[in-house]
């Protein structure tokens, strides 16, 4: 067994640093008796209340965004375009709405299960490259919203996988975010093929 990331990992203030440090960590799910895992290869940081790209911009509080205001170390899953379940990690202390979108993972364990869930015949990067794809492959849905990452359903492990170089660039699909659309708060492992098109 590899250690899960501790609560203190998520409770730190610097969401950009945490986003970078999640690269190379392993996102694991045990759902419906099926175990899957993938190396996190791509993340995006969201730093509300000032971040105009965040669902919690300007301390917006709705039924959907309330999860942001919990203490870090839980999952935030929302539906995009009514189709894709997107998995985020809530960070920082209570009432500070920071979150990190997990955009891509490299399949590691339970690949056959991932391919079955994604209805794939051939293994290629479309299996888990992209936030909707990775959630489907790992079995993550809205049912896992607010799930504690200390539990045994969805969690993140440190397996001491080295990450030599990280690329920082702009986030995807946030043209509405004015000056925040140009923040280099998307991170990915340089040279890794399991990255979304972005």
Swiss-Prot record:
<comment type="similarity">
    <text>Belongs to the DNA glycosylase MPG family.</text>
</comment>
<dbReference type="Pfam" id="PF02245">
    <property type="entry name" value="Pur_DNA_glyco"/>
</dbReference>
<dbReference type="InterPro" id="IPR011034">
    <property type="entry name" value="Formyl_transferase-like_C_sf"/>
</dbReference>
<protein>
    <recommendedName>
        <fullName>Putative 3-methyladenine DNA glycosylase</fullName>
        <ecNumber>3.2.2.-</ecNumber>
    </recommendedName>
</protein>
<dbReference type="GO" id="GO:0006284">
    <property type="term" value="P:base-excision repair"/>
</dbReference>
<dbReference type="GO" id="GO:0003677">
    <property type="term" value="F:DNA binding"/>
</dbReference>
<dbReference type="GO" id="GO:0003905">
    <property type="term" value="F:alkylbase DNA N-glycosylase activity"/>
</dbReference>
<keyword id="KW-0227">DNA damage</keyword>
<keyword id="KW-0234">DNA repair</keyword>
<dbReference type="InterPro" id="IPR036995">
    <property type="entry name" value="MPG_sf"/>
</dbReference>
<keyword id="KW-0378">Hydrolase</keyword>
<dbReference type="InterPro" id="IPR003180">
    <property type="entry name" value="MPG"/>
</dbReference>
């Amino acid at each position: 067994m590899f250690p899960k990331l501790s609560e203190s990992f998520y409770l730190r203030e610097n969401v950009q640093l945490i986003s970078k440090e999640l690269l190379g960590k392993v996102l694991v799910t045990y759902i419906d008796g099926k175990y899957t895992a993938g190396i996190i290869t791509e993340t995006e940081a969201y730093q509300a209340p000032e971040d105009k790209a965040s669902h919690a911009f300007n301390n917006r509080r709705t039924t959907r965004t309330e999860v942001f205001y919990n203490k870090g170390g839980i999952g935030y899953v929302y539906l995009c375009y009514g189709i894709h379940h997107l998995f985020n990690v809530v960070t920082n202390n209570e009432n500070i709405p920071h979150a990190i979108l997990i955009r891509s993972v490299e399949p590691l364990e339970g690949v056959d299960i991932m391919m079955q869930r994604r209805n794939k015949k051939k293994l290629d990067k479309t299996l888990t490259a992209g936030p909707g794809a990775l959630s489907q492959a790992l079995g993550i849905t809205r049912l896992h919203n607010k799930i504690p990452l200390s539990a045994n359903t969805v969690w993140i492990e440190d397996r001491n996988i080295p990450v030599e170089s990280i690329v920082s660039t702009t986030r995807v699909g946030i043209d509405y975010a004015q000056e925040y659309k140009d923040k280099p708060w998307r991170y990915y492992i340089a040279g890794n093929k399991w990255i979304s098109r972005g």
